[in-house]
């Protein structure tokens, strides 16, 4: 299963140049479907917000600081874990066999198991999993579960006037499960 689930991330190509990379946030939110480009966390479950991350860090290539195609919509946690990490000191060489953050090949390196935990498939994925984003110590399964529960709750809410009493109970159970998972995410600082 893909880290981003059903969401297909695609960047807009004709984005006007801005004088501050933070001005790209509204467009990034749309292009990244309101989820983290690295871990797939939806905005609804974060306790710390989202921000643009420079895929190629500024210390490696300062000329790309305002380049929209170099920005990733990232949850606070992924952005802080990645920081200025880049596998090589060469801006044009994104992969020395240790890591590759490029989205086209992302799914070949990382994915999710049937429970929603992130897993790696390659040595590149292992580096991202254990070093770049520290998925090995983060509650990724819980994040996946809560996003699925929120989606189910939203679907039920859309037909709330037609729900049976049994379905209303399911709605309340979903709400309770979401609140319990939110507590876990807060405690884990996600």
Feature roles, as predicted:
Residues 1-9, 22-27, 43-45, 64-70, ...:
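Extended charged
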Residues 28-32:
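Sequence/structural segment immediately N-terminal to covalent heme-attachment motifs in c-type
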């Amino acid at each position: 299963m893909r880290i981003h689930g059903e969401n297909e991330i695609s960047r807009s190509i004709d984005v006007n140049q801005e004088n501050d990379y933070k001005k790209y946030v509204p467009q990034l939110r749309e292009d990244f479907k309101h989820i983290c480009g690295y871990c797939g966390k939806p905005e609804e479950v974060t306790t710390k917000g989202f921000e643009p991350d420079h895929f190629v860090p500024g210390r490696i290539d300062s000329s790309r600081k305002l380049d929209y195609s170099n920005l990733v919509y990232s949850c606070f946690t992924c952005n802080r874990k990645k920081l200025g990490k880049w596998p090589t000191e060469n801006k044009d060489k994104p992969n020395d066999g240790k890591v590759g953050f490029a989205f086209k090949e992302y799914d070949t390196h990382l994915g999710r198991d049937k429970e929603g935990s992130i897993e790696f498939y390659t040595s590149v994925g292992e580096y991202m999993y254990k070093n770049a984003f520290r998925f090995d110590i983060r509650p990724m399964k819980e994040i996946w579960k809560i996003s699925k529960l929120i989606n189910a709750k939203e679907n039920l809410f859309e037909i709330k006037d037609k729900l049976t009493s049994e379905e209303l109970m399911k709605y309340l159970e979903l709400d309770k499960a979401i609140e319990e998972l939110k507590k876990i995410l807060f405690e884990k600082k996600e």
